[in-house]
């Protein structure tokens, strides 16, 4: 059973180009979380490449390369991945240009089977 529903986001002015930024990190006191909707919007005129990764420390657990050259002018990419996250896992995002908004809908506090 889920305890908390979250919407995590990073606005265009809140990230650095070609730098991994943490969109969401699972609290160590929770038993897990799940990403069930992810959206990226490109509001500028330039095309941009999007990357997403799930990491725990230095270990890459899951990697997603978004559509190559996501077009500008408000084009969005929506994706559902059903990724189960454990304590200390981080959902990180990276964009090759400015003007991108990242959003994720996350259920945290999942009761995972022992």
Feature locations, PLM:
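Exposed aromatic-hydrophobic patches
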Residues: 74-82
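Short, surface-exposed beta-strand/strand-loop-strand elements in extracellular ectodomains
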Residues: 45-66
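Short proline/glycine- and polar residue-rich coil/turn motifs
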Residues: 67-75
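C-terminal interaction-tip segments
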Residues: 1-33, 37, 43, 95-114
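Hydrophobic beta-strand core residues of beta-sandwich domains
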Residues: 26-28, 69-70, 85
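Short loop/turn positions at the edges of beta-strands in beta-sheet-rich folds
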Residues: 42-46, 85-87
């Amino acid at each position: 059973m889920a305890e908390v529903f979250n919407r995590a986001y990073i606005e265009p002015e809140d990230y650095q180009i070609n730098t991994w930024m943490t969109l969401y990190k699972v609290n160590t006191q929770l038993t897990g979380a799940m990403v069930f909707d992810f959206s990226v919007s490109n509001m500028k005129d330039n095309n941009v490449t999007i990357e997403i990764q799930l990491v725990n420390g230095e270990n890459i657990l899951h990697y997603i390369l978004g559509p190559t050259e996501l077009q500008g002018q408000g084009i969005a990419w929506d994706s559902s991945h059903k990724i189960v996250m454990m304590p200390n896992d981080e959902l990180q995002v990276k964009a090759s240009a400015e003007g991108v908004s990242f959003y994720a809908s996350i259920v945290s506090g999942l009761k995972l089977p022992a």
